[in-house]
Amino acid sequence: MNKEKKLSIMGVGSYNLDTIVKREYPEGFVPGKRNKFVEKVMIEEIGSNPGNVMCILGWFGWDSYPIALFDDSEEGMKMTSDMKRFGCNTRFVSNTPEGGTNLLKVTHALDDYGKPVRKFSKRHAPGSGFPRDKAFTVRGKDATLPKFIAGLDFFPDVYFYESTTAAWRDLGKWMRSKGVMVYYEVQRMYMKEFPKYLKCMKESDIVKFSDEAVEDLGFVDELKDKLVIQTLGAKGVRFNLRGAGWVTLPPVVNDNVVDTEGCGDWTTASFINALGKRGAVKFADLTFEIVSDCLMEAQEYASRNASFLGTKGIITANT
């Protein structure tokens, strides 16, 4: 827990209400055959990268302030309730008819050969006007982002976001101009929108992505004033601090893997928490030793969580 000093984080992105389903085969499973199955709902809670990161940091003891514009459906209300349950401050979370709520169904099943697989199905909540995420507006006399900024009465230690949405990028740029450390995470890079991603990365202090999300790293040469982190799955993690070249760290091995979903989110949240414990919440504080130590600690949490079903198994097991 982060008990020495009450640090704060503000974060935003694409939120989901995750429904984790496990398929069971009551008559057994025969590879290559059409096997009868039943689906059992195991977990239903807020998820996605920003949802998990903000909830995990709330659990770690941070003042965690997610920004979210949900609808007022049952699902949207549950997402707000879940944020509170995991220790978040929902001051900047709203549930209105104009909001939006996304649902993600994650099904744990067996493929035709009997190998465990995950299947994903995303949709929006019944009654939501649009499946898209809602954000502040940035233009026009009624733009809501300037009003949000004008109403802020504090600066968080860290601002986290993971989309290319203009409002969240502009908020990050403004936060950084005020001395807040900005952490940007790339979930999936679509090359036709690469200029948007690059703009977000250039206006951040820390940039993180996985080897699955980003393959071509030629752009890293343009980020020589950043900390760039790339997770490598079972191969560990590597980082490039201020353009000094890549440093690769070994993985933390887990021989009892149940579910790897959420490991990247634990890496992010645990890394931020580890920086906080070391008093390194300003980019100028970052050294190779601090980054290495914090990333190894982050990998330990991510590896532990892989022994549980769901993205926040460690928390559930400790409550």
Ranges and model annotations:
Residues 2-20, 82-95, 108-250, 279-284, ...:
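Ribokinase/PfkB-type carbohydrate-kinase core domain
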Residues 54-56, 62, 258-286, 290:
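Short, small-residue alpha-helix embedded
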Residues 86, 274, 301, 305:
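Short alpha-helical functional segments enriched in proximate histidine and acidic residues
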Residues 1-67, 74-78, 85-88:
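Glycine-rich phosphate/adenosyl-contacting loop at the front of the ribokinase-like
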Residues 36-45, 250-262:
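Short pre-catalytic strand/loop immediately N-terminal to key active-site residues, enriched for Gly-Thr
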Residues 101-108:
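Short alpha-helix plus adjacent loop in nuclease-associated cores
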